[in-house]
């Protein structure tokens, strides 16, 4: 049951990473979102083992799992920061949802400061233009 919980948790965390995109058209599977999901997921394994010891009585296995989850947390954090395995294609697949998030925030935020409202207008225009450009690049890279 532990691994079913963990597998479902990883899937949910990966999908939730995309809750900030402006629309489904900007959904792009990418390694950066996976790295971030693992960075959130692996500590959950530690918390589950630590807070429910009665459910996981095998001490030796638990110690091995603690070590695994610590390594996965550190490794995924490093992979995100180092942009490990992020090539041209992965770069645009990562940046499109990122830019889309800026559009969503500008559109949905309850802004009243005139300078911020104007800035958001510029952000939306620039980010959409850059998303279009990255989509063209992604097509070329396929």
Residue ranges and their predicted role:
Residues 1-142:
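Alpha-helical membrane segments of multi-pass proteins
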């Amino acid at each position: 049951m532990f691994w079913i919980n963990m597998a479902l948790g990883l899937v949910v965390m990966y999908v939730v990473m995309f809750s900030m995109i402006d629309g489904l058209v900007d959904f792009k599977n990418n390694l950066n979102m996976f790295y971030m999901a693992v960075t959130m997921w692996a500590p959950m394994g530690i918390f589950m083992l630590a807070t429910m010891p009665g459910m996981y009585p095998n001490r030796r296995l638990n110690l091995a799992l603690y070590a695994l989850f610590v390594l996965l947390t550190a490794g995924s954090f490093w992979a995100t920061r180092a942009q490990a395995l992020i090539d041209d294609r992965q770069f645009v697949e990562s940046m499109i949802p990122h830019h889309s998030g800026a559009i969503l925030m500008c559109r949905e935020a309850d802004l009243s400061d005139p300078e911020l409202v104007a800035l958001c207008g510029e952000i939306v225009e620039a980010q959409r233009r850059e998303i279009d450009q990255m989509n063209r690049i992604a097509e070329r890279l396929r």
